[in-house]
């Protein structure tokens, strides 16, 4: 088991949680948003850096990391301007296809913001759901009966010294029926 702590790195247990060992203390990041174990190879672990919250005290990250050996070593796989990664999903059909939901920078527009997809295990990334310069993707799920169907939640947000501005026209739900290549807005 693994756990990624918002401002406390990555931890691993081999005895059902009785004891935990830090496995990323020697990395350049401390802030994490999500962790995903590849269902095709449990030694392959994907890690999204940057806390998955919108508070003023939030820690930022520097992209997506991959461990091929159960957390012994880590390699940055890109999206260094994402700052806050909220979800990583490995395709149940293909270990080379990975989706990364990125909220992007909290204090400024742009960055690596949206839903990113790789079909070459992180060598290249394509932004497949980009709404606007203030809107990122905060959650993603794959339909368990048809893995070509995905649902994404977007969140338009901006923080300044005085306030957190959340919501707005970019906040919505989206659906894809072609494995994340195209998206349409769900009207609720």
Regions found by a protein language model. Name each.
Residues 1-188:
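Beta-propeller blade termini and top-face loops
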């Amino acid at each position: 088991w693994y756990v990624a702590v918002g401002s406390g790195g990555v931890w691993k247990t081999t005895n059902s949680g009785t004891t935990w060992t830090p496995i990323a203390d020697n990395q350049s990041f401390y802030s994490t948003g999500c962790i995903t174990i590849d269902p095709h190879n449990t030694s392959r672990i994907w890690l999204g850096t940057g806390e998955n919250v919108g508070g003023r005290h939030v820690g930022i990250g520097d992209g997506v990391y991959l461990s091929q050996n159960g957390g012994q070593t880590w390699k940055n796989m890109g999206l260094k301007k994402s700052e806050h990664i909220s979800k990583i999903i490995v395709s149940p059909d293909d270990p080379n296809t990975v989706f990364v939901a990125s909220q992007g920078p909290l204090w400024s527009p742009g960055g690596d913001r949206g839903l990113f997809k790789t079909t070459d295990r992180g060598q290249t990334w394509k932004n497949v759901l980009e709404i606007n310069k203030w809107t990122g993707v905060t959650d993603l799920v794959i339909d368990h009966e048809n893995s070509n169907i995905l649902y994404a939640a977007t969140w338009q947000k901006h923080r300044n010294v005085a306030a957190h501005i959340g919501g707005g026209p970019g906040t919505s739900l989206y659906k894809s029926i072609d494995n994340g290549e195209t998206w349409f807005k769900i009207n609720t």
